């Protein structure tokens, strides 16, 4: 395996869960610890120009081994795991030659069931890596990191012709800041691929337009016994805002190209409340309409409030759909498709119901579609990855590098 699984297990041992609403990058110390470890590993593996920025971005170059000119390409994965579920003390389980049925996650009652996750029916006979039911796994995106570095090692060991290959590992992707301090000029690639996708064959070149919304509500608290005409309950206003949004446009009611409003947190009291939403839409027109609706709903709910009570809405764009940017460079997609077919994998073109660092980088002049990792059920205790899928990802990365050199000859 050329240490593919060993690498993965090592990386998931680092607690790199990122945090939202933190001003500095990386948002957690664990990410920088993993970044330093990767920096050292890349140096030991023979990478050149290995660097680690103050913001936790690791970069390095695997030098080419051919005499002719080949475009420099890149591969990128992220260091952090989702804030949605703990990534501390990850204890991976190996299920060899999966035979079907429920997989016990650790000692308790948690199971990974094909009833809830039918994709397991396609995993028969494969080696699966699961959690112990207490944490997420971290295949998103430490499988990607392990796959990229393993592919680079195998290119060297097998003396496969390739040009310069840039590799980068970024912080805080899960909170939308992964590419904020990414130095595109220093990376110096013609195009790149994030290795941050899901099931085998996935190739993604379009993603959500995304924004985060903060709704701050200031009410007025008095004794409930004498509250008539005086009390303004901030929590009641919050529920009215949520009820005014379409109930059939939430994450749990949408799929494919449908967008949504997602209330991710609500905290508060009678006096004050704060709501956090994320807005998602594949089309820019729909995206802007969702933002306008948030302001309109807040204005309507807040109509007639006393002077000292108010509703304040702040919206910050996170990233945009990279579809048009990548479409200007069709060879980038065609190359990945051919590489997959050369590895006996049929490409599955699908939209990302989320975002990647590649979305932001594509808008900054680095076309960057997304490749699969072989992982499933991200951001939760039911996350798992197929070892065979990871091996296929390694093969595709290697084939992309080789094809790039072949076509430049």
Curated annotation (Swiss-Prot):
Catalytic activity: Release of the N-terminal residue from a tripeptide
Positions of the catalytic residues: 80, 173
Taxonomic superkingdom: Bacteria
Binding site for Zn(2+) 2: 140, 174, 379
InterPro entries in the record: ArgE/DapE_CS, Bact_exopeptidase_dim_dom, Peptidase_M20, Peptidase_M20_dimer, Peptidase_M20B
Obligatory cofactor(s): Zn(2+)
Top enzyme class: hydrolase
Molecular function GO terms recorded: metallopeptidase activity; tripeptide aminopeptidase activity; zinc ion binding
Family in the record: Belongs to the peptidase M20B family.
Classification via HAMAP family: Aminopeptidase_M20
Function: Cleaves the N-terminal amino acid of tripeptides.
Protein name, per record: Peptidase T
Organism: Serratia proteamaculans (strain 568)
Origin organism lineage: Bacteria, Pseudomonadati, Pseudomonadota, Gammaproteobacteria, Enterobacterales
Gene: pepT
């Amino acid at each position: 395996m050329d240490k593919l699984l060993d690498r993965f297990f090592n990386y998931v041992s680092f607690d790199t869960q990122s945090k939202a609403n933190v001003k500095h990058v990386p948002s957690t110390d664990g990410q920088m610890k993993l970044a330093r470890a990767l920096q050292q590993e890349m140096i030991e593996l023979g990478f050149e120009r290995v660097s680690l920025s103050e913001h936790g971005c690791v970069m390095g170059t695997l030098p080419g081994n051919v005499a002719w000119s080949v475009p420099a390409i890149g591969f990128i994965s992220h260091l952090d795991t989702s804030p949605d579920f703990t990534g501390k003390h990850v204890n991976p389980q190996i299920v060899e030659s999966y035979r079907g049925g429920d997989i016990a996650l650790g000692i308790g009652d948690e199971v990974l069931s094909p009833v809830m996750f039918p994709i397991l029916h396609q995993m028969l006979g494969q080696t699966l890596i699961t959690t112990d039911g207490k944490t997420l796994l971290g295949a998103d995106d430490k499988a990607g990191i392990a796959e990229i570095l393993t592919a680079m090692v195998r290119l060297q060991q097998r003396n496969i012709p390739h040009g310069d290959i840039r590799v980068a590992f970024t912080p805080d992707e899960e909170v939308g800041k992964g590419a904020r301090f990414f130095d595109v000029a220093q990376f110096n690639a013609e195009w790149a691929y994030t290795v941050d996708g899901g099931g085998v064959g996935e190739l993604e070149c379009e993603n959500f337009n995304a924004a985060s919304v903060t709704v701050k509500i200031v009410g007025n608290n008095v004794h409930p016994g004498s509250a008539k005409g005086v009390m303004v309950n901030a929590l009641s206003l919050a529920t009215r805002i949520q009820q005014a949004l379409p109930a059939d446009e939430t994450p749990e009611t949408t799929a494919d190209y449908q967008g949504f409003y997602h209330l991710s947190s609500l905290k508060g009291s009678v006096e004050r409340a704060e709501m956090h939403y994320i807005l998602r839409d594949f089309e820019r027109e729909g995206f802007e309409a969702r933002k306008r609706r948030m302001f309109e709903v807040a204005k309507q709910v807040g109509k007639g409030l006393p002077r000292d009570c108010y509703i304040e809405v702040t919206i910050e764009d996170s990233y945009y759909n990279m579809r048009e940017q990548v479409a200007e460079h069709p060879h980038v997609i065609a190359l990945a498709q051919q590489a997959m077919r050369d590895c006996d994998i049929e490409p599955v073109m699908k939209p990302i119901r989320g975002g990647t660092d590649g979305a932001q980088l594509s808008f900054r002049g680095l076309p960057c579609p997304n490749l699969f990792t072989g992982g499933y059920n991200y951001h939760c205790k039911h996350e798992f990855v197929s070892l065979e899928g990871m091996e296929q990802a390694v093969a595709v990365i290697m084939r992309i590098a080789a094809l790039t050199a072949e076509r430049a000859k």
